[in-house]
């Protein structure tokens, strides 16, 4: 004798009636069929949805092979109580609007959609009491997340809850605002850098103005330079300040006033001596590298230079000769050596 799988054995009335029928041999009735179990009104919500009709057998009759149980619907009002697609429904709390995900019996079923265990829910509920009321916005019912066994994913609900919790503190709000608007935080630094750049741009402009004035004055200086040189040649002055002024005026006159095509590359050399003066000094230097005081005075009068100017020129010429001789010696040594 077989029973349907959905029939519960929790009702004592049904179990007792079956046992008594088997003991009193009233189980084998002479009627054409037997109806079991009898209907009862106190079955509650866990009622049987099917019932079986078994054909009756006489005593000591061999069980027929083709005998089977005819299944008929029982308690039809239960079908309207449940969903059409489900056989049983578990009521959800009022705060949880997320539907549960059903699995087969051999798979561990989780009741929550957002992938949190019971322990995790308890911990979070202690920190954020209104967690379940904030969930439906971030976890929509239309496209719920399916919990995968063995994995833990940090859903968006946890992030939104944390950000709402942190936004109460001023530090958290400031950091969030800095992350949302990084350009606004860098504005003071940019303004300081812009001020420095403006200062640097203003300095060259102010520096270019005196150069323009010197360029304008340079043609006049060129015209007056030969006269000044002739006057200096006639009247010999021993002060070094006059020499420095003369060299500065020559440097100003040498500044290129023409366009960039005629400009010369490289550093402009100081040439306070004329070609005639340098030629006479070079002749004397080849004859004698070191001068006495009397000979130096004679040369200074002949070349229209001061005693100090002639002395400095000879010192510089000796240093130049020394440098040239050193370079020539190094060049000869490197030429004789063979590198493997």
Swiss-Prot record:
Transmembrane segments: none
Comp. bias (Basic and acidic residues): 242-253
Cellular component terms per the entry's GO annotation: chromatin; cytoplasmic ribonucleoprotein granule; cytosol; nucleoplasm; nucleus; transcription repressor complex
GO BP terms, alphabetized: adult locomotory behavior; anterior/posterior pattern specification; embryonic limb morphogenesis; embryonic skeletal system morphogenesis; forelimb morphogenesis; hindlimb morphogenesis; negative regulation of cell cycle; neuromuscular process
Residue numbers of Phosphoserine PTMs: 238-239
Compositional bias per record (Polar residues), positions renumbered to this chain: 208-217
A molecular function GO annotation: DNA-binding transcription factor activity, RNA polymerase II-specific
PANTHER family: HOMEOBOX PROTEIN ABDOMINAL-B (PTHR45874), HOMEOBOX PROTEIN HOX-D10 (PTHR45874:SF5)
Disease: Vertical talus, congenital: A rare malformation characterized by vertical orientation of the talus with a rigid dorsal dislocation of the navicular, equinus deformity of the calcaneus, abduction deformity of the forefoot, and contracture of the soft tissues of the hind- and mid-foot. This condition is usually associated with multiple other congenital deformities and only rarely is an isolated deformity with familial occurrence.
Protein name stated in the entry: Homeobox protein Hox-D10
Species name: Homo sapiens
Gene: HOXD10
């Amino acid at each position: 004798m077989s029973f349907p799988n959905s029939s519960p054995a929790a009702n004592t009335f049904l179990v007792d009636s079956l046992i008594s029928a088997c003991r009193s041999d009233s189980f084998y009735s002479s009627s054409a069929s037997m109806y079991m179990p009898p209907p009862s009104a106190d079955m509650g919500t866990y009622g049987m949805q099917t019932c079986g009709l078994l054909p009756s057998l006489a005593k000591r009759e061999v069980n027929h092979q083709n005998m089977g149980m005819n299944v008929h619907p029982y308690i039809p009002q239960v079908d309207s109580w449940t969903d059409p697609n489900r056989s049983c429904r578990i009521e959800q709390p009022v705060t949880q609007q997320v539907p549960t995900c059903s699995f087969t019996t051999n798979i561990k079923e989780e009741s929550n959609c957002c992938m949190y265990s019971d322990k995790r829910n308890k911990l979070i509920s202690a920190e954020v009491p209104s967690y379940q009321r904030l969930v439906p916005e971030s976890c929509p019912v239309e496209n719920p997340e399916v919990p995968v066994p063995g994995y833990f994913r940090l859903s968006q609900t946890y992030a939104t809850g944390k950000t709402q919790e942190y936004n109460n503190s001023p530090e958290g709000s400031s950091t969030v605002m800095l992350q949302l608007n990084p350009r606004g935080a860098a504005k003071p630094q940019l303004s300081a850098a812009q001020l420095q750049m403006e200062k640097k741009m203003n300095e060259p402009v102010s520096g270019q103005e005196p150069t323009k004035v010197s360029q304008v004055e340079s043609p006049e200086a060129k015209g007056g330079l030969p006269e000044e040189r002739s006057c200096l040649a006639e009247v010999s002055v021993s002060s070094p300040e006059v020499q420095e002024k003369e060299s500065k005026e020559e440097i100003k006159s040498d500044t290129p006033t023409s366009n960039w095509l005629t400009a010369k590359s490289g550093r402009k050399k100081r040439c306070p001596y004329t070609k005639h003066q340098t030629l006479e000094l070079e002749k004397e230097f080849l004859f004698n590298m070191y001068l006495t005081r009397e000979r130096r005075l004679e040369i200074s009068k002949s070349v229209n230079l001061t005693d100090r100017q002639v002395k400095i020129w000879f010192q510089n010429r000796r240093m130049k000769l020394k440098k040239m001789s050193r370079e020539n010696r190094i060049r000869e040594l490197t030429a004789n050596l063979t590198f493997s």
